[in-house]
C-alpha cells in the first residue's frame, strides 16, 4: 500500500471526466454554481456539453434526468448536503423510480461528505447522505477512500447505466490503492490488510483512520467498503467469518 502521492479525489475525478469528454461526445457535465479548476477547462472546451444551472439543485436533477433519458451520460456536481437533501424528492422520483422503467445514467457527485467542510458550520455538514441514498431502489452509492479508486471508477460509471451517488471528502488524501491491487467494483469492498482476530470495516476518508489505527495496534485487518449499495453481501460475510 502506498501513502506517498497526495491529491484530492475531486480534482482527480473531474480531470478524468474532462479527458473522457474528449473521447465520448455523449458525456455531459452539469453543476449547481460550484466551481473547481478542472471545470474551467470543461466549460471552455466543451461548452455545448457543460451547464451551470445556478443555485438550484432540484433543477440540476431535473435537467440531468432529461439529458440521460435521451441517452446521455450525465455527471451532476454540487456540495454533498445540497445535492442529496435539498433535491431528495427529485432524486427519488426522477432518478430512482424512473430508472426502473428506463435506463438512466446520472452520476451525482457530492463533494464534502461528512465533516469535510467543518468550518462552514452545520449547513455544510453531511452526515445523513449514506442513509438517505441507500434507501433508494436501484441506486448505486460509491464512497471511495482515495483518488486512485475514484479514478478507476470513471469508466465503470460510464458503462453501468443506472443512477449513482459518488461521495467523497473535500480534503487532500494519500494514495491507498496501487495498480497491483485487483479491485472488483461488483464485490464492493477490498481487504486492504489481512488480520487475525480483529477487522476494521470502514469507508471513505475513515479508511485512512483505520489504517493509522492498524499501524498503532498491530495485527488488525482492514476492509475498505467503497461500494455502499449494492455490494456482494455473501462474499463480505465469508470474509468476515475468518475473524
Model regions: which residues?
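Thiamine diphosphate
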Residues: 1-167, 172, 182
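Loop/helix-junction capping segments adjacent to catalytic residues or to phosphate/diphosphate-binding pockets
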Residues: 84-85, 207-208, 229-230
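Conserved strand-to-helix beginnings and helix N-cap segments that scaffold or border functional pockets
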Residues: 88-89, 127, 210-211, 233-234
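Conserved beta-strand elements of the Class I
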Residues: 28, 199-201, 221
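Generic long, charged, amphipathic alpha-helical segments
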Residues: 216-242
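Short helix-loop-beta junction
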Residues: 47-48, 209-223
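Glycine-/acidic-rich phosphate or pyrophosphate-binding loops and their flanking alpha/beta elements
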Residues: 8-20, 152-162, 172-216, 234-237
Amino acid at each position: 500500500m502506498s501513502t506517498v502521492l497526495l491529491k484530492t479525489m475531486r480534482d482527480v475525478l473531474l480531470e478524468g471526466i474532462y479527458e473522457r469528454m474528449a473521447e465520448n461526445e455523449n458525456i455531459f457535465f452539469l453543476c449547481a454554481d460550484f466551481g473547481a479548476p478542472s471545470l474551467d477547462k470543461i466549460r471552455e472546451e466543451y461548452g455545448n456539453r457543460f451547464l451551470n444551472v445556478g443555485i438550484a439543485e432540484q433543477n440540476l436533477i431535473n435537467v440531468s434526468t432529461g439529458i440521460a433519458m435521451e441517452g446521455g451520460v450525465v455527471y451532476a456536481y454540487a456540495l454533498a448536503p445540497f445535492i442529496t437533501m435539498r433535491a431528495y424528492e427529485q432524486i427519488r422520483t426522477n432518478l430512482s423510480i424512473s430508472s426502473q422503467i428506463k435506463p438512466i445514467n446520472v452520476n451525482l457527485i457530492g463533494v464534502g461528505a461528512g465533516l469535510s467542510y467543518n468550518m462552514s458550520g452545520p449547513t455544510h455538514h453531511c452526515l445523513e447522505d449514506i442513509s438517505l441514498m441507500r434507501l433508494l431502489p436501484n441506486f448505486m452509492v460509491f464512497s471511495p477512500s482515495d483518488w486512485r479508486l475514484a479514478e478507476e471508477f470513471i469508466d465503470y460509471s460510464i458503462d453501468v447505466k443506472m443512477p449513482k451517488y459518488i461521495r467523497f471528502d473535500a480534503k487532500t488524501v494519500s494514495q491507498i490503492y496501487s495498480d497491483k491491487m485487483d479491485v472488483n467494483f461488483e464485490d464492493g469492498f477490498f481487504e486492504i490488510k489481512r488480520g487475525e482476530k480483529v477487522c476494521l470495516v470502514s469507508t471513505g476518508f475513515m479508511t485512512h483512520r483505520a489504517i493509522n489505527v492498524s499501524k498503532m495496534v498491530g495485527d488488525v485487518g482492514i476492509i475498505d467498503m467503497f461500494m455502499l449499495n449494492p455490494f456482494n453481501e455473501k462474499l463480505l460475510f465469508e470474509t468476515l467469518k475468518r475473524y
